[in-house]
Amino acid sequence: ALSKFYYVPGGPETVILALTETISKGTIMMPSEVSTNCDPASWEYPPVRSDLIQTIRDNLPSYDPITSATEGLGVTPEYFRTLPDVVRSNHPYLPIAIWGKNKIQIAQKQPLNLPYGINSPLDYLYKNNGKIIFLGTDYETCTALHYAESTINRPTETCLAATGIDEQGKTTWTEYQNVDLDSYDDFNDLGLAFENQYSEYFNQVRLNSSFVKVIEMKPL
């Protein structure tokens, strides 16, 4: 959310250069989800007319880690995933873009089912004492919290994602299992409670009208 900082000279390139210089020999991950790569019957903003659903199913571009743009995440994740030294995982709906140490191995291990759960990039982040960085954002958009949702045996639902093209030129779809990532709206409440009780596990600095926060993932 660079807009929260008013003006950053160089835009997302400046941000990424600062991160890579600071992290140096570590690993950086950013969400790079393709939020429309799902069954058009489930779209809500806006919903699809019933007579157009099958047409979209037959023609929606399937996921490509190189060409499929991120959606709804802002300019920084979109810029990050296009960099030549960044790899992107193959999950068709919830891929992660990764730079640095072990990036290929981390990307290759992301499972189709429960893509934010065990063996996912978030699992690697958790087990290696990773940190979460908020750049003008808050807990409402904290992707790392989905790791908790995915590892506490919550019920799953069947999802669809476009993954290829058949011999007739129509889009093919793949089913996978995932928890409902939108069923709870309490991430900010959880984050506020965490900061009030465990202030030793996060740091923040003000930058113009917003904050940069660094939070330890495992305690959160």
Identify the residue ranges that each predicted region occupies.
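N-terminal and secondary-structure boundary signal
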Residues: 1-220
